[in-house]
């Protein structure tokens, strides 16, 4: 065949394109299991942060420290479980499907330290945003959070994931019981002090999107929270059951005074 002909050039180009496409397809198939494993590891790391659990080996730490991982419906009823030994967790695609699903199966991660972690997922300014919220035993008081995003503006909306002080602001805040369960807004626009945190200056849209996402997902879990949250009285009862008696409060004697 004449290597200078147009026919040769076309055939050569087609063969080259087919070879490159085959190599790319093979590489994608070969690398996908490793990519999926990395995504799962990152997801579990975020869950552990919300649960205030630390460990060098993320997967091993998760297996050791989690008590159980369940799925609940909108009524707060348990409808399934996640395999803890295999570190089975819901990824972002799984969470996205639950938003529009008529029969929801929402993940709940319950840890041995008493922290319960639930996820959230929604739309930010430039792409998806997500997060994990760790609750105290009352399932109202937030212990810790970890947020992530795909394309928010660096230095502005991206601060939901990058700014430690923003995450720290959630600690001690509670989920409300009214029409709005939680807000991320400027102080002047917030309805309550305890059921929300301040929005970032210059990142109003991302802040509002995160607030709406949290409010929506807390609504999904509202019945579960109401049915499973531990009250202060139940905490006292649990202490009595464990010790067999409630220790009396020891009176503190006043300090000696100096007589003139």
Q: For the regions a protein language model found, what residue spans apply to each?
A:
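Flexible, solvent-exposed loop/hinge segments and secondary-structure transition points
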Residues: 2-260
